[in-house]
């Protein structure tokens, strides 16, 4: 089977052929650290974490780099508002990033380079562009000559004449027009302003432009050409377009073999924004505070919600959608916990194979442009079967399904679940939710049976309703009462 990826640059799905066979160099644009991460960030970093996990499962050696933009107008504005420094704001929200994103079971990248730690590398790259005639200095600023890069616009599919200044709100809108030789030239270096952090440079004191930062950090950490460059779809233009212009003009090599972008997160069909009042941060959602008016949401339910849609498609966040994801996670979690609850009783050994047919189907889906939403169907097939077997074991004490077959099913579920970052253990408070144990449920059913025997039907109904509120469905029959979790 061949792993294929949709390439934004070529607008088609292509086989993954890395620079060095068996190894993947991957870079994803990180956050500008001036605020808490929101649902859009959650989607991006869950997606790239899962792609990384999948590539490793497929046998690749992956080096994954994700930067922090720790110098930016938004950071400076936040520092002024709070009466603090740029470094204090950056460090605070870098710590917050890790606190929030790790709750979603996102693995740490191999490295997190910061812009402020790569000023010399940025200077060097600008000087190369200047020597090649693709950059010019004026009044302490340095700009990129867009017209000197003939293929500018190849990633976004735009002609230079059709482009609009200020796209994504990040194209040097603070630069005065007379400084530029062309209206679409963009800043590589910005002259110092009073009261703002600045670094010495060949062009005088100043700070880097936004786009040059990623080009310099990629070159420093991964070399001239990487395999996969990831990010949100809103970064295609101008940020990624400008990265290509800078890096490829300087190095005379492709910056990335594959450009891959995840879709945007909508809230009730609208773009998420503070002005619309639908801006939700990760910690608000997980803790049930602030803009999120509902109950705290399980982190694994958030991860499941993200993976239920193909990564390139828009994702609409609604209360109903997240509630459905929570219910789906309960089903999956019950399957993932099956081995912990019944493995000893079934006499399982330490080692067990996975079911090759299911692993193959999962891989076929994943190899098709990371179709993790399709792969989830394999997990739910296993989880539902294990939940059914668990109910049989509770009620009858034994099952007709061979023990070794159940162990293979469970091991397959756990193995493939880990590929998607969907994991649960009995002792992990972040991955499990409080609720009634099997023993609690059986005790309540006995109380209900006693109430029915005494014709106390109001008490019987109360217990049924209590169990139903806890996600437990009762099935009465002449042979007795059976139950299952919803």
Curated annotation (Swiss-Prot):
Binding residues for Zn(2+): 29, 214, 239, 243
Pfam families: CysS_C, DALR_2, tRNA-synt_1e
Cofactor: binding comment: Binds 1 zinc ion per subunit.
The EC number(s) this enzyme carries: 6.1.1.16
Keywords, comma-separated and alphabetical: Aminoacyl-tRNA synthetase, ATP-binding, Cytoplasm, Ligase, Metal-binding, Nucleotide-binding, Protein biosynthesis, Zinc
GO MF annotation, one: cysteine-tRNA ligase activity
Annotated InterPro entries: Cys-tRNA-ligase, Cys-tRNA-synt_Ia_DALR, Cys-tRNA/MSH_ligase, CysS_C, Rossmann-like_a/b/a_fold, tRNA-synt_1_cat_dom, tRNAsynth_Ia_anticodon-bd
Residues reported in the UniProt entry to bind ATP: 274
Residue numbers covered by motif 'HIGH' region: 31-41
Catalytic activity: tRNA(Cys) + L-cysteine + ATP = L-cysteinyl-tRNA(Cys) + AMP + diphosphate
Required cofactor(s): Zn(2+)
UniProt motif 'KMSKS' region: location: 271-275
Main location: cytoplasm
Biological process (GO), any one: cysteinyl-tRNA aminoacylation
Domain of life: Bacteria
GO cellular component, one term: cytosol
Protein's cellular compartments: Cytoplasm
Classification via PANTHER family: CYSTEINE--TRNA LIGASE, CYTOPLASMIC, CYSTEINYL-TRNA SYNTHETASE
Subunit structure: Monomer.
Family as reported in the entry's similarity comment: Belongs to the class-I aminoacyl-tRNA synthetase family.
Protein name (record): Cysteine--tRNA ligase
Source organism of this protein record: Trichormus variabilis (strain ATCC 29413 / PCC 7937) (Anabaena variabilis)
UniProt lineage: Bacteria, Bacillati, Cyanobacteriota, Cyanophyceae, Nostocales
């Amino acid at each position: 089977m061949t792993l294929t990826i949709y390439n934004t640059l070529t607008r088609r799905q292509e086989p993954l052929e890395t620079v060095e066979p068996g190894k993947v160099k991957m870079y994803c644009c990180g956050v500008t650290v001036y605020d808490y991460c929101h649902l859009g960030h959650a989607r991006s970093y869950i997606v790239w974490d899962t792609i990384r996990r999948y590539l490793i499962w497929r046998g690749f050696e992956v080096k994954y780099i994700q930067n922090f933009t720790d110098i930016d107008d938004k950071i400076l504005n936040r520092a002024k508002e709070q009466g603090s420094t740029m470094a204090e704001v950056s460090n605070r929200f870098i710590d917050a990033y890790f606190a929030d994103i790790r709750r979603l079971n996102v693995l740490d990248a191999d490295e997190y380079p910061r812009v402020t730690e790569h000023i010399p590398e940025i200077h060097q790259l600008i000087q190369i562009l200047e020597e090649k005639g693709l950059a010019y200095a004026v009044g302490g600023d340095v700009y990129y000559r867009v017209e000197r890069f003939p293929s500018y616009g190849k990633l976004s599919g735009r002609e230079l004449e059709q482009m609009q200044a200020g796209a994504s709100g990040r194209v040097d809108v603070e630069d005065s027009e007379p400084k530029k030789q062309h209206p679409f030239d963009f800043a590589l270096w910005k002259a110092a302003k009073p009261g703002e952090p600045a670094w010495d440079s060949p062009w005088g004191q100043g700070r880097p432009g936004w786009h040059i930062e990623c080009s310099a950090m990629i070159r420093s950490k991964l070399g001239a050409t990487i395999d996969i460059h990831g990010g949100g779809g809103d970064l295609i233009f101008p940020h990624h377009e400008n990265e290509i212009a800078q890096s490829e003009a300087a190095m005379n090599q492709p910056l990335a073999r594959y450009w891959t972008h995840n879709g945007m997160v909508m809230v009730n069909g609208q773009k998420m924004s503070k002005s619309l009042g639908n801006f939700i941060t990760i910690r608000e959602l997980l803790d049930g505070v602030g803009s999120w008016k509902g109950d705290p949401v399980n982190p694994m339910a958030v991860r499941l919600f993200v993976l239920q849609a193909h990564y390139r498609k828009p994702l609409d966040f609604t209360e109903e959608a997240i509630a459905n994801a929570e219910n789906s996670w309960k089903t999956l979690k019950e399957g993932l916990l099956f081995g912990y609850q019944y493995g000893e009783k079934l006499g399982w050994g330490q080692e067990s194979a996975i079911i090759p047919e299911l692993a193959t189907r999962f891989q076929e889906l994943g190899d098709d442009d990371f179709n993790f939403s399709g792969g989830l169907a394999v997990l739910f097939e296993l989880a539902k079967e294990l939940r059914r077997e668990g109910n049989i074991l509770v009620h009858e004490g034994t099952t007709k399904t061979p023990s070794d077959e159940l162990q293979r099913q469970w091991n397959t579920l756990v193995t493939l679940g880990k590929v998607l970052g969907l994991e649960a253990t009995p002792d992990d408070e972040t991955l499990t939710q409080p609720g009634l144990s099997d023993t609690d449920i059986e005790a309540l059913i006995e109380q209900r049976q006693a109430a029915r025997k005494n014709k106390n039907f109001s008490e019987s109904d109360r217990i049924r309703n209590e169990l139903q509120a806890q996600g437990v469905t009762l099935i009465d029959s002449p042979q007795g009462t059976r139950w299952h979790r919803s």
